[in-house]
């Protein structure tokens, strides 16, 4: 092992059993965690269909200790499974899936940058949290919130420019964003706070989990 540099499993036949077993285990844990999060009701956020789902931690583990391909596969499998208990919240499932994919890619990117640092995983998850908060807050303003409101019939168009204009004029919408009367300020305040808290929780679980997996599975991940 060279410092904190992670060596991925080589694509050899005798590693296939480990790949399948570990991926299946991570998928099962991700599904269970995602399901549990649906029963955790937090005032205000639950009314907006926002859940603090931290199942992505296990998808990230698969990306590092098996492969990116396997991780993307179980991410899609987890998303499809979520439709069983989220049949009326298609946009919510797609949003969580998008957040999971961005988390996987950001952790891979920042691991390449910080792999030689002493507290590697802390830096990886810290910058992933900040990047996700910025990306998803922006997407919520431009795409996700307009689609969500259009899907449930709150607005007549998913065009974010028109939605922002209607929000600013109609005080009935202000409930969604802490009573703030400006669409973009409301988007920033709500979703930056939500995403920082959510991915902060992901980091709190992700750092010790990744360090534990790194410790106990390292020998199996070394390419000899």
UniProtKB/Swiss-Prot annotation:
Alphabetized Gene3D superfamilies for the sequence: 1.10.1760.20
Cellular location(s): Cell membrane
Keyword annotations of the record: Cell membrane, Membrane, Transmembrane, Transmembrane helix
Signal peptide (UniProt feature, chain positions): none
Entry's Gene Ontology cellular component terms: plasma membrane
Domain of life: Bacteria
Chief site of localization: membrane
Entry's transmembrane regions: 25-45, 54-74, 91-111, 119-139, 142-162, 174-194
Protein name according to UniProt: Uncharacterized protein MG350.1
Membrane protein topology class: Multi-pass membrane protein
């Amino acid at each position: 092992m060279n410092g904190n540099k992670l060596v991925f499993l080589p694509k050899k036949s005798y590693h296939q059993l480990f790949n399948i077993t570990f991926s299946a285990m991570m998928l099962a844990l991700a599904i269970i965690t995602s399901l549990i999060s649906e029963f955790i009701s937090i005032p205000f956020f639950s009314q907006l269909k926002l859940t603090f789902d931290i199942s992505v931690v296990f998808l990230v583990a698969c990306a590092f200790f098996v492969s990116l391909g396997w991780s993307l596969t179980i991410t899609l499998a987890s998303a499809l499974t979520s439709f069983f208990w989220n049949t009326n919240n298609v946009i919510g499932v797609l949003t969580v899936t998008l957040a999971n994919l961005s988390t996987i890619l950001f952790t891979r990117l920042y691991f390449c940058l910080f792999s030689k640092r002493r507290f590697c995983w802390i830096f990886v998850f810290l910058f992933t949290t900040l990047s996700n908060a910025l990306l998803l807050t922006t997407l919520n303003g431009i795409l996700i919130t307009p689609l969500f409101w259009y899907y449930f019939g709150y607005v007549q168009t998913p065009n974010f420019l028109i939605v922002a204009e209607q929000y600013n004029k109609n005080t009935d919408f202000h409930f969604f964003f802490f009573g703030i009367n400006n669409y973009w300020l409301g988007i920033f305040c709500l979703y930056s706070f939500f995403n920082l808290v959510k991915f902060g929780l992901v980091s709190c679980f992700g750092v010790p989990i990744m360090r534990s997996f790194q410790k106990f599975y390292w020998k199996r991940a070394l390419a000899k």
